[in-house]
Every structure is written in C-alpha cells, then in structure tokens.
Curated annotation (Swiss-Prot):
Oligomeric and partner information: Homotetramer.
Subcellular location: Peroxisome; Glyoxysome
Natural source organism: Hordeum vulgare
Catalytic-site annotation from UniProt: 65, 138
Protein name listed in UniProt: Catalase isozyme 2
Amino acid sequence: MDPCKFRPSSSFDTKTTTTNAGQPVWNDNEALTVGPRGPILLEDYHLLEKIAHFARERIPERVVHARGASAKGFFECTHDVTGLTCADFLRAPGARTPVIVRFSTVIHERGSPETIRDPRGFAVKFYTREGNWDLLGNNFPVFFIRDGIKFPDVIHAFKPNPKSHVQEYWRVFDFLSHHPESLHTFFFLFDDVGIPTDYRHMDGFGVNTYTFVSRAGKSHYVKFHWRPTCGVSCLMDDEATLVGGKNHSHATQDLYDSIDAGNFPEWKLFVQVIDPDEEDRFDFDPLDDTKTWPEDLVPLQPVGRLVLDRNVDNFFNENEQLAFGPGLVVPGIYYSDDKMLQCRVFAYADTQRYRLGPNYLMLPVNAPKCGFKNNHYDGAMNFMHRDEEVDYYPSRHAPLRHAEPASFPVPTRPVVGKREKTRIKKENDFVQPGERYRSWAPDRQDRFVRRFSDALAHPKVSHELRVIWIDFLSKCDKSCGMKVANRLNVKPSM
C-alpha cells in the first residue's frame, strides 16, 4: 500500500460512519445498553472512542496571541533588492511565494473580544524554495521591553491577576515603572491606533532588527514594514464598545467575508536598512526594539506586496496548529544581536513543542513545501514515512552531504566582550515618545491623555506610582505630564 496515498484526509471520506480505525458504525444515535433501559456496556468501543476524542479536542492555547485568524495567499517581489540580500524568494521582481498569515490579539484568551485595546499580532509564513521563513511582528513598531529575560514578567503583568483572574492596570504600571523604555509602546497603545477597525486596515511591523546578507557577504541591519493598500482605520472607544457588544469575532468575520467576496486584502512590504558600520551615528541603539528608525534618516525602500486570496480550509488545522518561530530564517536573512529577538528564537520553538508536540513542523500547515532531509527521527506523533537505513551523519553508505557554505552566508562581524549582565548604553527612552506626542493634533493629544489618565486612576495604583508615571510623561513632553497630573489631581515632582 502506498503509505502517502491514504494518509488521513477528507478526500477519502466514506459514505457511512466509521470509527477512527475504519470499522463501520451501524448506530451513532444510541449507546449500547443491556435492554432499552439497562446500563451502558463498556464494549461499546465507538462510544468510548467518541467521548475520549471529544475530551481531548482542545490543545493548550498560545500563552500569548491565543485569539487569532488566518488566511492564505502569496507574496510577490516587486523591486530589485538583490544588492541587499541573496534570499531566493526576493531574487527578482515578479517572483511569487505562497504564504499563510495569522492576525491576533496578544494578551487575552481564545474567544475574547477583538475590540480590546491591545497590540495586534501580524505573522507571515513564507513557503520559499529554500525553506520556510517566518516574519513575526505586531501592528506597533515597538515593544514594551528591550531584553527578553523580562518577557515572562511583562506578559504576567498584562495577564489577569492570578488571584482574581481580572486584568488590572495597576499591575502593568507597577511592573513597567521599572522599565521607562515601555513609554514608547504606550504612546501607540493609548493612541487612536490602539484598536484597529479590523485586520485588513492595520499596519504590520517586524519590530525586531534582522540582518540582510548579500551574495557577496555584506550585511545590513533591516526592519520590515507592512502597509495596507486600503489604508489604516481604527475604532474610537465608543465605537469599539458598540462593535464588540454585537460581535466578539468581528475582525475574524471581516477577514473571512472579504476574501470570500473576492475583496482580497493587500499590503506593501517596505524595509529600512542600516549599515552596521554606521550605527553609532544615531542617538539610539538600532538593536533596541523600543525604538523606531526615523524615516527621514532611514527611508523606506519598497520590496513587494502581500495578497490574501484564500480562506483557510479548516480553522483548527490552519490556525490553531499553525506555528511560527523567529528562528526560521532562509539564506539571505539572519538574526541580529537584538536582545528580544535572540530570546524569541528559542522561546517560540519551545512553546510550539509544548503546545503541539516535538514534531509540530511535520503538520501540513507548518511543513516546508520544498524538499528537506535531516536525521531528526521518531518522537511523539511522528507520521513521516521514511525507509532509510542510515539515521546518522556522516556515513559511507548514504549520499547525504553538507550544503555549500556559500549557499547560506551569515554575518561575519567579530563579537568581542566580557561576560556581563548589563543594560545597553544608549537607552534614550523619552525622546521618541515625546516627538510622537507632539506630532499629533490637539484633540488626539487630549484623547491620549484621557486614556492614560483613566488607566492610572485605577484605585490600586498608588500615589507613588502616579507620580513616577507623570514624571516619565513629563520627560517625554512637559505639557503631557502636566495634563495627566491635573486630571488625577497629582502634583508632579518636577
């Protein structure tokens, strides 16, 4: 029997019900009992299998980004970037690559409203000819912290109180009062862009700094930007309350219905690049994910377009079992020493192994569409057909060999230093948030002040914490801090 032809698929559905092993089920309406009113018999294998499977339908939800929706489509390279990267899928304008994209909220559980003031995830899996590349980002270009060792803490602070299971902002302000670098993200979260109208009308950002590597081995730091062709649209607070009260899944439904109607969402991909030899000319660290790269200093360069033209065939298979990881890169794209990215490379793969199992990359939605070969054998739920006799390397009995080093160039800059746990030198946490605030119209500034003040007004936010945050805001913009202080009737310390 062909081991691949009859692998489980709805393509081979029978006309009558069966067990998972294929035995006919002659009655799926009544359990097997002793007489019409007698006890149920344990020999009713179909009943036991049905109940046991039902009890195990749910898998652990993602610790973050649990609430999400996916769609499929393609990425098309539209501009020549071969001088920056040797990535095959960017080899020439017109080259197309199949993709699957997952949008999500961040903090709350699966099934929570999609109108919550919360960052949105924007993750893209490129099925390239040289393996899968996962670009994971958010709709904000910055993050709350810059060092991955604090990632569990910041998520714990935003998650519901472990005692009451209620999300409370006093916990957020308490923790992040030790991390003023979080201010920049707050100037997005409490801004008008804090609640996207839907997934089609929001930006996407890679957030972390990656590295482009050219065929010649030249490296450039790179940041990725997605811009929707239909423009950015967001909900005001009262609109979000109204929309969320009617439909908790409005963004998921909008994405599905739009694609179903032939109104395909599209984004343009842009990059910013910095020569590592010139990084010292900036007043911030280019590897700090709490900072943006000013577009007047580092202009956007067009790369391609992303089009979503197909809905998923099955939500569980292609959304819940869909697994992303920043560690999945392809030749021409590499990591940087961004501290958050370095931690994410391990963390995401590890959480997928917990959530889906050690062979999660064998699941059809996660498997590459190109050929692949390694000696990773066995493990729970391994369903890959293999008939080799050699499962080690090297061997004189098997033709497996290493890829040529030139096929996967990596950055070659030397790294020299002593072992230490320390902060980066160029923190500069208040300049960019202040510049962003001053770029807004007065009414937009007022809405930000109101939202921030309302959050700080939580009864468990102490006077000390309010003074700290007003001091932070004042360092960004003196008038902003003063307005928040006046709303809270707090005298600022400066």
